[in-house]
Amino acid sequence: LFRSTAMVWDVVGPVCESGDWLGRERALAVRPGDLLAVLSAGAYCMSMASNYNTRGRAAEVLVDGAQATVIRQRESAADQMRLETLLP
C-alpha cells in the first residue's frame, strides 16, 4: 500500500517497555518495507547498548553525503551465545 500523503504514527522501539518511544505523533509518508533513520538514538547507539530482553545490538551505519557504509555489523544470536557456558 503506497501512501503519497503523510499519516500520523507513534514510533516505538523493539522492547516491551512503556518508555521505549522514539517519536510520538509523527507525520510520516511511509509504506511497508520502508526504513526509518533514527538520529541521536541515545540508548540505541553502541556506547549505551545492552542485550536487554536478548535483543541483539544494532548495526551502525556511517553516512557521508550520499555514501552509506556499515561500520559495525548487527549482533547475531550466535554472537550473544558465544560467551555462554552450558553446564553439564
Feature roles, as predicted:
Residues 2-88:
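Charged (often Lys/Glu-rich) extended helix/loop segments that serve as interaction or gating elements
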